[in-house]
């Protein structure tokens, strides 16, 4: 399950955590800690004849209480140990390197070599191939391949370039080729890598609101049980005198009873559940800026999902050639192939492949044709080829219409009908024109990812609404939304429209999650309850989000929601189990503890425990051992299933509520029998 090194380190840390300064952070376990100290003191007082407490029995109680505290420490130390193991690999990427600081951006020969730790925000550095990027920054000049495997674990290099949404670089990553001029955006100790290490190690982990609320509940229950236990000594003294039978409860038994009734199981595991949840997110290559963000992910009920890369494969594929009247399909395919032969985009290559498959149209001798290729630009929104007094263009319908009209041609109405048909089916139409004559339309189809419809169905079962965000026109968006099975869509989306949509849902009381990578996504990311910024995105997007996906995968949002829900479920399930345990331990201890004074209570000794001594020993042994038994579950998390919240609650109440009632009865009885057979009691 875990490496031996982590186990060994956790055992050492368990003893170090016995420090009062650390124990006071967990009020419930502090109660056990104080109880262990008191029981130990009573043992020594009894040993030297100062007290009437049974020395052997008191020693056994004291030792079991100390082990209970150690087991709780061990659970937390194991979770922290996993985090430290992750952090150690990250620290290897964080090392001080010499940086070429430019005095003048325009003169790359005029540099000062400074240590990366001495760089300040705004400094300009020059990085060459095979060098490590010294600090987080924004590329202001150049384009290069960057190896980010030290952070993301992905071995394939990624492109980083100035301008656009791929300009952010991370300190500790390595340039594979070319060069970059980078403006530093962080100082030592505040870099992305530093934040990752701090988060993974748990150094900057703060208790979440739900965690604090649960701890307040546990402390309140502990105080109530403390008050009840404190009254037992005078009460039993009075009752035994009045009944003329039995004797007052001993201080050792009061301590043992208090520890058994207090919610120690969840108190011991609460911290490890939170740390393990953060660790699971880190293992998914997601950095959360706070535990609050993970909890919010568990409560999310609206997901805003980008169409491209999340719902569709991202690369549209040519599926049909649709000619206008008077033009054959092969004629259209021939012109489309010529206009796309130099197009290196996935869409362009798919047009060439389709022409070859349908009509066996292959490459030409472009040198002999004296061909000149026309690349696509955002201004013209067209690409094409000029050869031997022929001109072919392909592009968006409105761009081609403007081109044809400007050159004195006529744009056929029939083409409008074909364009509308393609858009209505969820495709992207590209119009082809040769020598100012419209030939027809290339049908580019968005390929919806396999299994995505089923995933959205699962999300719907969980009560989560999915909304597709796309820049496509409403007809295209509606067709893709229907095919993918999302609940709603936002077409022709702008940054302002996304921001307003998030606010609208939040006003209705929903929690909203979204992903983004560009500077234009920053306002919406800042507004969303769970905002996942892509690691390939801009600095502005990363700063606006409360999570960063190191893999830059838009589909990761669904996994983040699952991890958040699993964290909340694990905490809820173990709390239910712990409270149910207390009820069972109550029936184990109270009857045998008091039937000397009140013989009628013998009827409540449902387990038939041998004696008060064996009952208390069995109960506190179980109380300690159950912590160790539940550590794997607290670290791994309760298995999450896609079903409505009501069914999920009923299922967990049955497993962890009823299970929490039955397990102690069986375990305590078995321990009691073992103690009796061994002659310990």
UniProtKB/Swiss-Prot annotation:
Record-listed Mg(2+) binding positions: 517, 521
Gene Ontology MF annotations: ATP binding; ATP hydrolysis activity; magnesium ion binding; P-type potassium transmembrane transporter activity
GO biological process annotation, one example: potassium ion transmembrane transport
Superkingdom of origin: Bacteria
Active-site residues per Swiss-Prot or TrEMBL entry: 306
Entry's transmembrane regions: 30-50, 59-79, 216-236, 255-275, 587-607, 615-635, 661-681
Keyword terms: ATP-binding, Cell membrane, Ion transport, Magnesium, Membrane, Metal-binding, Nucleotide-binding, Phosphoprotein, Potassium, Potassium transport, Translocase, Transmembrane, Transmembrane helix, Transport
Membrane topology: Multi-pass membrane protein
Pfam families reported in the protein's UniProt record: E1-E2_ATPase (PF00122), Hydrolase (PF00702)
Location in or out of the cell: Cell membrane
Enzyme Commission numbers on file: 7.2.2.6
GO cellular component terms listed in the entry, alphabetical order: plasma membrane; potassium ion-transporting ATPase complex; potassium:proton antiporter complex
Annotated InterPro entries: ATPase_P-typ_cyto_dom_N, ATPase_P-typ_P_site, ATPase_P-typ_TM_dom_sf, ATPase_P-typ_transduc_dom_A_sf, HAD-like_sf, HAD_sf, P-type_ATPase_bsu_IA, P_typ_ATPase
Binding-site residues for ATP, renumbered to this chain: 343, 347, 376-383, 394
Record field: catalytic activity: K(+)(out) + ATP + H2O = K(+)(in) + ADP + phosphate + H(+)
SUPFAM superfamilies membership: Calcium ATPase, transduction domain A, Calcium ATPase, transmembrane domain M, HAD-like, Metal cation-transporting ATPase, ATP-binding domain N
Function: Part of the high-affinity ATP-driven potassium transport (or Kdp) system, which catalyzes the hydrolysis of ATP coupled with the electrogenic transport of potassium into the cytoplasm. This subunit is responsible for energy coupling to the transport system and for the release of the potassium ions to the cytoplasm.
Known partners and oligomeric status: The system is composed of three essential subunits: KdpA, KdpB and KdpC.
Family, as annotated: Belongs to the cation transport ATPase (P-type) (TC 3.A.3) family. Type IA subfamily.
Name used for this protein in its record: Potassium-transporting ATPase ATP-binding subunit
């Amino acid at each position: 399950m875990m490496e031996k090194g982590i186990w060994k380190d956790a055992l050492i840390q368990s003893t170090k955590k016995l420090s009062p300064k650390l124990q006071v952070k967990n009020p419930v376990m502090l109660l056990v800690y104080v109880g262990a100290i008191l029981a130990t003191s009573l043992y020594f007082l009894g040993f030297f004849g100062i007290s009437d407490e049974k020395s052997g029995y008191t020693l056994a109680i004291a030792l079991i209480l100390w082990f209970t505290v150690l087991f709780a420490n061990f659970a937390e130390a194991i979770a922290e140990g996993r985090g430290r193991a992750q952090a150690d690999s990250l620290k290897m990427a964080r090392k001080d390197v010499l940086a070429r600081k430019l005095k003048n951006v325009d003169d790359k020969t005029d540099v000062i070599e400074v240590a990366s730790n001495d760089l300040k925000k705004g400094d300009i550095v020059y990085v060459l191939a095979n060098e490590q990027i010294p600090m987080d920054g924004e590329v202001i000049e150049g384009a290069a391949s960057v190896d980010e495997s030290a952070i993301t674990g992905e071995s394939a290099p990624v492109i980083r370039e100035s301008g656009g949404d791929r300009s952010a670089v991370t300190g500790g990553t390595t340039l594979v080729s070319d060069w970059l001029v980078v403006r530093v955006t962080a100082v030592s100790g505040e870099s992305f890598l530093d934040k990752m290490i701090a988060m993974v190690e748990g150094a900057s982990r703060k208790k979440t609101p739900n965690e604090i609320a649960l701890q307040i509940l546990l402390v309140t229950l502990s105080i109530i049980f403390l008050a009840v236990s404190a009254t037992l000594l005078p009460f039993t003294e009075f009752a035994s005198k009045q009944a003329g039978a039995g004797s007052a409860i001993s201080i050792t038994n009061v301590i043992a009873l208090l520890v058994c009734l207090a919610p120690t199981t969840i108190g011991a595991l609460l911290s490890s559940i939170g740390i393990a949840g953060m660790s699971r997110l880190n293992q998914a290559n997601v950095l959360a800026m706070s535990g609050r963000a993970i909890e919010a992910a568990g409560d999310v009920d609206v997901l805003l999902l980008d169409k491209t890369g999340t719902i569709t494969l991202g690369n549209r594929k040519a599926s049909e050639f649709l000619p206008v009247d008077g033009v054959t399909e092969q004629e259209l395919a021939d012109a489309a192939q010529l206009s796309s032969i130099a197009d290196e985009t996935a869409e362009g290559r798919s047009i060439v492949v389709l022409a070859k498959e349908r009509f066996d149209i292959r490459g030409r001798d472009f040198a002999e044709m004296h061909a000149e290729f026309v690349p696509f630009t955002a201004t013209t929104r067209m690409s094409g080829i000029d050869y031997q007094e022929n001109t072919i263009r392909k592009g968006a319908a409105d761009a081609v219409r403007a081109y044809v009209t400007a050159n004195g041609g006529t744009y056929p109405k029939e083409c409008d009908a074909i364009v509308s048909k393609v858009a209505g089916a969820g495709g992207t139409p590209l119009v082809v024109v040769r020598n100012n004559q419209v030939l027809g339309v290339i049908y580019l189809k968005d390929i919806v990812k396999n299994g995505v419809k089923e995933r959205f169905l699962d999300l719907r079962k969980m009560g989560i609404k999915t909304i597709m965000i796309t820049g496509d026109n409403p007809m295209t968006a509606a067709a893709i939304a229907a095919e993918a099975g999302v609940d709603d869509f936002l077409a022709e989306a702008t940054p302002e429209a996304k921001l307003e949509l998030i606010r609208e849902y939040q006003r209705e009381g929903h929690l909203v999650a979204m992903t983004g990578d560009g500077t234009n996504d920053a306002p919406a990311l800042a507004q969303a309850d769970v905002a996942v910024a892509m690691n390939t995105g801009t600095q502005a997007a990363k700063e606006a989000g409360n999570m960063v996906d190191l893999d830059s995968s838009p589909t990761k949002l669904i996994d983040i929601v699952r991890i958040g829900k699993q964290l909340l479920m694990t905490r809820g399930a173990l709390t239910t189990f712990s409270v149910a345990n207390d009820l069972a331990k109550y029936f184990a201890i109270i009857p045998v503890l008091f039937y000397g004074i009140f013989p009628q209570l013998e009827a409540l000794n449902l387990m038939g425990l041998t004696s008060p001594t064996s009952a208390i020993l069995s109960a506190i042994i179980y109380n300690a051992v159950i912590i160790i038994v539940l550590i794997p579950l607290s670290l791994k998390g309760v298995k999450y299933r896609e079903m409505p919240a009501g069914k999920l609650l009923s299922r967990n109440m049955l497993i962890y509520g009823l299970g929490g009632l039955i397990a102690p009865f069986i375990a305590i009885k078995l321990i009691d029998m073992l103690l009796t057979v061994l002659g310990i009691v």
